[in-house]
Structures are given as C-alpha cells and as structure tokens.
Amino acid sequence: MASVAGVSHQTVSRVLNGFSKVRPETRDRVLAAIEELGYRRNTAARTLVTRRSGSIGVITADMNHYGPASIMLGLESASRAAGYSLSLAGLPEISATSLRQAVDQVLDQAVEAVVIIVAHEAALALAHSLHIEVPFVLVEGDLSATPLTAGVDQIAGARLATNHLLDLGHHSVLHLPGPLDWLEATARREGWRMALQEHGCRVPALMVEGDWTSRSGYGAGRAMLAESRPTAVFAANDQMALGLLRALHEAGLRVPEDVSVVGFDDVPESGYFTPPLTTVRQDFRELGRRIMALVLRRLAGELNASVPLVEPRLIVRSSTAAPSN
C-alpha cells in the first residue's frame, strides 16, 4: 500500500489511525491506494498487537426521537475523526437487567470505553449503580451527581425561549412539558420557571404532559384551549409545537397574531412549519466532539475529567410576535 501511494509505511499508519497531521494530498493518495487494493483493516489482529480495539461502546434508548438520534450522529462523526469506531447496544426497556445486558454486550466486543446516553432519571440511577470495567461517560446526565457528563444546557435553552416571549411583551408564558421522567424535560421546565420568576411573573400550572410527539402536542393544545386563552406558549420540543400549531389553527387562532409559539431542538423541518417556528437550536455536532473529548481524557487516566455544557441558541422565525392586545 505504501508503494502504491508513494509514501512511507509510517505515513500509511498515520492515515489508518486517524492522525490529523497528514497533508490532505498525501491522505488522498493513501485513501486512493486503500480503495485500489481493497484493503480492510484486521481489527482482531490489531487488538492483539496493540491491546487496543479502537472501539467505543454506546448504549442508548429512544433512537426514534430526534435528540438521541442526533447525539448518535454527532458522536459518530467525532469518534471517526479521533480514529475510533462505535459499537451500539440498544435498551428495549429501562431496567437494571436491560442496562446490564447492554453493558455486557459492548464489553464483549472489547470496547475501550462506554458512553451511556441517559435520557431518563431511572436510567441515570441504574447507570451509577453498575460496575463498569472500563471508563464510561454519561450524556445528558446530572452534573451535580458526576462530572463525567456531557450535554446541552437545557435550562439555559428554556430560559432563552421564555425570555424571548416575555421580552416581546407577553405577561405570561404557558409551558407544554415533555415527559417529566426525562431529564431534558425537567430541565426545560426548570428553565421556564426560572425565567418567569426572574421577570416577576406568576408561574402558571403546567399543561398536560406530552411525550415528545406531535400527537401529544395536539392533544395538549386542545386541552389548553378548553380552559384558557394564552398569548404565548413554550413547547418542550418542535414536534409537540407542531401539534400545538394544528390545535390552534383548528380553533381559529392565528400564530403569531393571537398566540406566539416557541419550540425546542430546531429540527430540520421547523423552518417549514406554518408559520416557520421560532425555536432553540441544540448543536449536536459540538456535543459529539465534547463527548469524545471526555472519553479520550478518561482513557488518558483523568478520573474527574469534565467538559462544559454546550450552549444552545435561539432561532427566531415567524411564530412569535408582540401580543396584539
């Protein structure tokens, strides 16, 4: 391969192992030689020689939801750039048995570290109770419980959304929460509450709890309109905001003229809602980089390594405006 590419064996090794200090044109020649020769790395042999598998185990549930799926994509990109591959194990249910089986599954593949994408309070508690023989990192966990956590600042994101509506002149903001056994949902609820209190506003009772789906947002919207007529609503994610928009439309209410709506996530479709949705963007690519940085620091022996939370960003579109009255 080195002969075909016209480079040294050391250069081929650096390209194969993902080192960044290789000139782009040299890397391209090596990759072309790999393609021409049909080279496939013998991972088992490499593991025996180096005692490193170059693999990170990832345990997650709820991959059908935008957040966990996007975290996986961001982590996959960051791990590849660092020269690692991912070994995935799913959780069919949140239980000690299921989590232990998933951990054993990835450990059987000789992974060097384990990343647990924690969305539920119960899963977080179970993760802390396990004995894992390799370094591990939690995603969207509780920073107060362990520094070995990477995530997006959900409280800050909810404050951005709520402050935006209050700064437009709305006297109160209702909140459509996600499932409150999810850590993200409870953090977004807390950020909403904090923003209202900082503005001296009364904190309204929570609306019907949603489950992240458009259907639940629609149902919560109908229940809300049967009891009150808000001027501003912060939905815990964009999909629930979409269902809420449908409920408002069916009730003959205009967005944003009658009711302003803010979502959370900035899913790719949110700019094409009717109207385009004001929302809070989570940078999952940056989150993937920080997860991988935390993994590498743990592998280097830093027992209390930490990384800062990713800061979310408010994306203002056409679903919010000052109250008409």
Residue ranges: model-predicted function:
Residues 8, 54, 112, 170-172, ...:
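Short acidic/polar active-site loop segments enriched in Thr and Asp
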